[in-house]
């Protein structure tokens, strides 16, 4: 994306503040006009006092400097108050809109599909959010405080200077044009270099975040020195990329100072010649020297702003790229909130592909009656999770229909659909908040009594009450203050509070030891009662009592039936069951043999 396109996108993000933006634009125009009135009055006062009156377009009629001085005071006061008003409202606009865009960005990324979040580090998204909104704030502030005023000053000065003395005006703009061309060349040169600097910054951030996120691994494998050395290597690459940029911007400083000196001297030289020929006055020479100083200052502001924009461009580019990510699904204009559903789920010839080539599920059809338990079995990548994602409407199928209670779920609001579906994940997901706050995710208005009842039904009340703070106990980041079994039971309690008619269990006990699994299974039996339940399982012992088992392979259901029926068919499921139970029997035999061996040792 070009620098100009980044700039226009930044201004588009002003959104509802555009009206105030236009007000500030008018104020900046008045400010630019008033600022150039001061050099004009100064020059005319010099002419009046020297007696060398100009004969040009703005020749003073008064023979006394006092009226001109009074006008100067008036313009000066107007400039002061107008500058204060512009600065105040520009600050408020930039701060207010930064918060609005930050909130909008946060809402947007929460709506993006899980595939996006799986491929994007959460730390990067937070960095992009904070750095991007800060960059937007600085650009907006610079635009309304300096950049816009500088551009308007150029528009005011061009006709004004030509009107006063076109000869001096042509020299002034020729020299400033050279300055602008040289500066533009430097800016173009550094734009690509700055992108490399920001890329190195991202690598540095990712390297540090990666090490800090695995600090236990770093310490246990004695990798502190290695990680520090790795970070230092990336930091050295960053510094090497930064040095050429600094050199080019040092050249800009030299060009700016040289331009100021050369322009003032050139105007004085031409002014002396024109004065000797009677084509200009001393006051006009003074006036154009002031014009030159103001113009160079304004051009410096523009260059400084462009420099700032160029430095911020990679951050802004990242921010805009995330905003341009399209959510996989959205509410249709005529979507309805269905209220509480009964839980009749139908898949009718459903096909879906992530890449448009290889189908993740193909011609999937089945019906789950309210209260039934449907187990999904198959190898990793067989299509189980994709089928559940389609039910949850993380994606829409390319063909076929998913219905609940006879309604196409694409015609339901996302909020209305997902209120009817509860999920217990393989890894219990908890916020870094109190246990009560985590449980109320399922039901925000739940009373303390409801929390206790849900925790009791989920076999979680005992460990909660053993804590000194009870339901106010902090779960820690991602629930790390709790054991795996405790986290999972809280996840089940949360689902009980939500009380959905449809429940999804995604390998809910696969990472637990036998004792903890037994407790969690008791809780799962409680939460599954009376609900349409979908169980994704690799351990077949957990789905023995499922109403129906769907066996997936390459996106298709190749077998369907009860546990005993599928074993009797001697097909793919029977092979899986035989393999798993043989492994379990072998494990038991090994344990027994070890015990016998230990008992006969002298």
From Swiss-Prot:
Its EC number is 7.5.2.3. Signal peptide: none annotated. InterPro entries: AAA+_ATPase, ABC1_TM_dom, ABC1_TM_sf, ABC_transporter-like_ATP-bd, ABC_transporter-like_CS, P-loop_NTPase, Type_1_exporter. Residues 345-579 form the ABC transporter domain. It holds the Pfam family ABC_tran. In NdvA the ATP-binding domain (NBD) and the transmembrane domain (TMD) are fused. Homodimer. This is Beta-(1-->2)glucan export ATP-binding/permease protein NdvA.
């Amino acid at each position: 994306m070009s620098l100009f396109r980044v700039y226009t996108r930044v201004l588009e993000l002003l959104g509802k503040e555009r009206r105030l933006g236009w007000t500030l634009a008018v104020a900046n125009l008045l400010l630019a006009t008033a600022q150039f009135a001061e050099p004009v009055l100064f020059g005319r006062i010099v002419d009046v006092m020297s007696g060398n009156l100009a004969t040009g377009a703005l020749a003073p009629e008064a023979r006394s400097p006092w009226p001109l001085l009074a006008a100067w005071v008036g313009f000066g006061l107007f400039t002061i108050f107008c500058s204060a008003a512009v600065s105040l409202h520009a600050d408020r606009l930039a701060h207010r809109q930064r918060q609005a865009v930050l909130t909008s960005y946060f809402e947007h990324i929460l709506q993006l599909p899980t595939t996006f979040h799986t491929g994007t580090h959460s730390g990067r998204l937070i960095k992009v959010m904070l750095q991007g909104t800060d960059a937007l704030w600085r650009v907006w502030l610079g635009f309304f405080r300096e950049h816009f005023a500088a551009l308007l000053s150029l528009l005011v000065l061009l006709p004004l200077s030509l009107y006063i003395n076109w000869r001096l005006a042509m020299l002034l703009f020729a020299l400033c044009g050279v300055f602008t061309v040289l500066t533009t060349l430097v800016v173009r040169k550094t734009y690509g270099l700055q992108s490399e600097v920001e890329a190195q910054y991202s690598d540095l951030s990712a390297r540090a975040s990666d090490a800090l996120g695995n600090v236990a691994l770093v310490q246990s494998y004695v990798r502190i020195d290695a990680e520090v050395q790795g970070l230092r290597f990336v930091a050295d690459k960053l510094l090497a990329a930064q040095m050429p940029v600094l050199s080019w911007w040092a050249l800009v400083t030299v060009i700016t100072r040289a331009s100021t000196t050369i322009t003032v001297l050139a105007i004085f030289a031409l002014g002396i010649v024109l004065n000797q020929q009677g084509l200009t006055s001393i006051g006009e020479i003074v006036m154009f020297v002031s014009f030159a100083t103001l113009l160079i200052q304004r051009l410096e502001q523009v260059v400084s702003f462009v420099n700032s924009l160029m430095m911020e461009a990679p951050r802004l580019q990242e921010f805009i790229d995330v905003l341009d990510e399209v959510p996989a699904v959205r509410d249709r204009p005529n979507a309805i909130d269905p209220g509480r559903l009964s839980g009749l789920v139908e898949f009718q010839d459903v096909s879906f592909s992530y890449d448009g080539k290889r189908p993740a599920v193909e011609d999937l059809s089945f019906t789950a009656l309210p209260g039934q338990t449907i187990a999904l079995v198959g190898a990793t990548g067989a299509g189980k999770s994709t089928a559940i994602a389609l039910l949850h409407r993380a994606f829409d199928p390319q063909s076929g229909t998913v219905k609940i209670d006879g309604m196409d779920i694409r015609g339901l609001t996302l909020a209305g659909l997902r209120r009817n579906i509860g999920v217990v994940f393989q890894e219990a997901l908890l916020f870094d908040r109190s246990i009560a706050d985590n449980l109320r995710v399922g039901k925000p208005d739940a009373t303390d009594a409801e929390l206790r009842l849900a925790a009791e039904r989920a076999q979680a009340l005992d460990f909660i009450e053993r804590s000194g703070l009870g339901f106010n106990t902090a779960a820690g980041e991602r629930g790390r203050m709790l054991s795996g079994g405790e986290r999972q039971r809280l996840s089940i309690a949360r689902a009980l509070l939500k009380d959905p008619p449809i429940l999804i269990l995604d390998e809910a006990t696969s990472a637990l030891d036998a004792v903890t699994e037994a407790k969690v299974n008791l809780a799962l039996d409680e939460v599954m009662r009376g609900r349409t339940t979908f169980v994704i399982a690799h351990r077949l012992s957990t789905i023995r009592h499922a109403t129906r088992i769907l066996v997936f392979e390459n996106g298709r259901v190749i077998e369907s039936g009860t546990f005993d029926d599928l074993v009797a068919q001697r097909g793919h499921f029977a092979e899986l069951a035989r393999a798993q139970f043989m492994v379990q029997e072998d494990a038991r035999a090994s344990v027994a043999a070890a015990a016998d061996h230990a008992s006969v040792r002298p």
